[in-house]
Amino acid sequence: MKRTKRIRALCAELAPCVTFADVGCDHGYCTQYMLEGNLCRSAVVSDISAGSLSKAETLLSAYIAGGRVTPVCCAGLDKIPQDTEQVLIAGMGGEEIMTILREGFLPPALVLQPMRHTPKVRAFLLERGYAIVRDFTFRDGKFYDVLRAEFPWYRGAQPRGYTERDLEFGYDNLRSPSPDFLELLQEEMRKCRARLAAAQTSVPAVEARLNRITEVYDDLTRSV
């Protein structure tokens, strides 16, 4: 099966571990990657939708039969073993991801791909003692943010000092900007300008956002 750029980007952030869980697994491609590469001993795939979970069950049927994968239909982390070492949560809103973690448990390692509210997710992780070791944006049709976070005691991850700008735009994006991230900034500037052009009055919040994005873009393109 040919994995999409999005799936490949997520897989690239998954580290070897003993136990792995894919929450909101959809087709189960990331779990397949972990198992095919012998990157985990066992895995749990979960989804709140039995229909979506069945896709992963079909893809991973041989591993399920062999006892290496356990499929569970549940909300969030409800039926995920609390000793799970690494958890992937991708394709959900940032608020939903934070709710799942608040109501569940905090695993040693997380790979997250929030669809919205990524700055809030960054702050949430830092407040709970995680070191965010990867934080970048890529494009696969849409723009996606990916975060890899670990507790420092897990594998010796070193916390990185986050500024307000890092929280808003992403630590790695600001230090090693990809063409995809620069495209995102250009697109966001166009959207802000279009909103301001269509507005009948001043929109201070949009003007302030445009100024922040423009400043970041100018800083990054001067240094590229």
Q: Which ranges hold each PLM region?
A:
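Glycine-rich SAM-binding Motif I of class I
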Residues: 28, 32
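Conserved S-adenosyl-L-methionine
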Residues: 36-42
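C-terminal substrate-binding/active-site "lid" region of AdoMet-derived donor-dependent transferases
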Residues: 102-150
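Conserved SAM/SAH-binding beta-strand->alpha-helix loop
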Residues: 49-50
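S-adenosyl-L-methionine
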Residues: 54-82
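An accessory alpha-helical subdomain
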Residues: 152-224
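Conserved alpha-helix/loop element of class I SAM-dependent methyltransferases that forms part
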Residues: 2-17
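Conserved class I S-adenosyl-L-methionine
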Residues: 17-26
